[in-house]
Amino acid sequence: MDNKIILLVEDNPDDEALTLRALRKSNVMNEVVVARDGVEALDYLFGERSYSGRDTSVMPELTLLDLKMPKMDGLEVLRHIRADERTKLLPVVILTSSKEECDLIQGYSLGANSYIRKPVDFVQFSRAVQHLGLYWLVLNVAPPKVMMAKK
């Protein structure tokens, strides 16, 4: 599991810390890149602004995407991810506290691979993150990197 990058897109520092703690507690030792808003997430993925020197042929194995964020919300980020040849096959899991059915429907309509509501209880949250890591980083077969790196 350990050389696959996870992109965590989360604006809430408490939720970021909980997610990172839950990943470590679940023995997910992958590198986690944190983007604190939607614009930063896209900058990372496409190697723009502060990420202009990043090797964009190296894409995350998994993106954990919050929905309610400043600058650009998660649904708009997802729209951009799916519209670009380099990232359209990138596994994206929406990890949000939103209980709005319209977010769920729109997330899947825009191409989310999964939609997980963050449990309030840390033990349940840790368990959810453990299952998430096991499935997406161990069991799931991701698209070939060659397909995602093409532009």
Regions found by a protein language model. Give the residues of each.
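Hydrophobic residue at a beta-alpha junction
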Residues: 71-72, 81
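Short, glycine/charged-rich "phosphate-handling" switch motifs in NTP-dependent
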Residues: 113
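Conserved acidic segment of CheY-like receiver
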Residues: 4-14, 19-24, 63
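Acidic, metal-coordinating helix/loop segments flanking the phosphotransfer/catalytic sites
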Residues: 18, 24, 33-62
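Receiver (REC) domain active-site loop signature in two-component systems and cognate sites
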Residues: 67-69
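C-terminal output helix
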Residues: 40, 120-133, 141-146
